[in-house]
Amino acid sequence: MKEEPKQKAAAPGLVYFHIPLPEFSSFTSSNFTGVKQEGISSPSINSGFFASMVEAGDVKAAFIGHDHVNDFSGKLNGIQLCYAGGFGYHAYGKAGWSRRARVVSVQLEKSDGGEWRGVKSIKTWKRLDDPHLTTIDSEVLWNRGSNGMTFSCRVCMTVNP
């Protein structure tokens, strides 16, 4: 049996939970992508969970739900904080605002010999539940540079398939 190669560095972490952290209130309309159409329903007590994610150093993005007509994403202390947007029809929404789901895509590197390597990039976008299943707000959350260094950037655009 062939021994698997050891992981050289921590993989970029992605965190998923339902209730937004108080830090989601840190954004203004000038420093996020997407829309904020209702208040942030976070706990009144800050548990320190966000500070723990920052301290861990490997968490690149956190994804939450709860506030169904918010779908924004913004970066705070090196971590992209992303609302999922309301998708289901079993809960509240906003008339005229298409239901949407946030998609997260993680691309892995492959060696010349076809072996899987580390994570190459993490991207996200939202898919609307409209007649065209429109893709909006595409962003690169994280990627590995050609020199092995990591960097993050934001690219915001609307793409129709």
Language-model-detected regions and their locations in the chain:
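His/acidic metal-ligating clusters that form di-metal
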Residues: M1-D71
